[in-house]
Amino acid sequence: MALSMEFGFSIGSCFKAPNPPVLISASPNKINFTLRRRKKRFLLRVSAVSYKEFAESALEETRKRIVLEPSHLQEKYSSMTGLDGKTELQMLAFKSSKIRLLRSMAIENETMQVFDFAGFMEPEYDTPIFCANFFTSTNVNIVVLDLNPLHQLTDQTDYQDKYYNKIMSIYHKYAETFPWGGKLTGESIKFFSPLVMWTRFSSSKEKHKALFSAFLEYYQAWLEMTIQVREEMEPSHVRANCEAQHKYLTWRAQKDPGHGLLKRLVGEAKAKELLRDFLFNGVDELGTKTFIDYFPEYQTEDGTVSDKRSIIGKSYETRPWDLTGQFIG
């Protein structure tokens, strides 16, 4: 389950519902009533948020413009119940002539909701990767919304000119409502664009309405890119696109901080399967390079992958792009 590339802190701590405060009273019945009332209030706050509308609206917009058909993954992954018997996981997977995989995962129980929506292109197209990772609990919302660059922008400035410079106004429209959310590691920042909305906030009707609006605007911008992009005919460029997407998927499948939550919900084996075969499908199909091949700095003395979130130790507490989208570090 993908919440973000890497936040520089443990996501796991955010998935625990806060203990409702105990009010001292001479009456045990009154204490129990207060606890139940507070707990109900927390549950209502979570249930008031539904990300189903986000997925439905995105798919509706897509079907207006292109022909979608079910991915082969839809038959294998559609729904799942957590080990607790209460948590529901709902999955959708589609494809088109240009889109290799358009998929969604929604996780919901009494104390949290998670929404992960992503779009990956066929290797013949260099369009960015659509990335929406939203988490809502009783006390916090964590949001990452971006058009992740297929090719790292520090290496290819023409790629930024092609896809980002003309749509920076979308980011500026929501920057004040959704300010920068805190540290991002130096390793993960390479996979984000200057459009990225990385934020944390307390729930409110106004905030979630603004988030829905931002989600649709980002998605419509990405959808327009997929329609306008021309097929790459040069074999070397297709190979470069394929390897770039494989590198991205390999990073996400290995270092996604949502792994811990999935493990608790469905067990270690099923969590790894969901990460590699559904959420980041393509790791085993688009290339043969390993995580260490792409990121040798993570190799330990015994040849395994380090569990550390960051090796270089650099993080960005403030937004590392200027108003024009240029990286300033």
Curated annotation (Swiss-Prot):
Enzyme class: oxidoreductase
GO cellular component: chloroplast
Single GO MF descriptor: phytochromobilin:ferredoxin oxidoreductase activity
Claim: Chloroplast is one of the keywords in the record: yes
Reactions that this protein is recorded to catalyse: (3Z)-phytochromobilin + 2 oxidized [2Fe-2S]-[ferredoxin] = biliverdin IXalpha + 2 reduced [2Fe-2S]-[ferredoxin] + 2 H(+)
Family that this chain belongs to: Belongs to the HY2 family.
Name of the protein described by the UniProt record: Phytochromobilin:ferredoxin oxidoreductase, chloroplastic
Naturally occurring in which organism (per UniProt): Arabidopsis thaliana
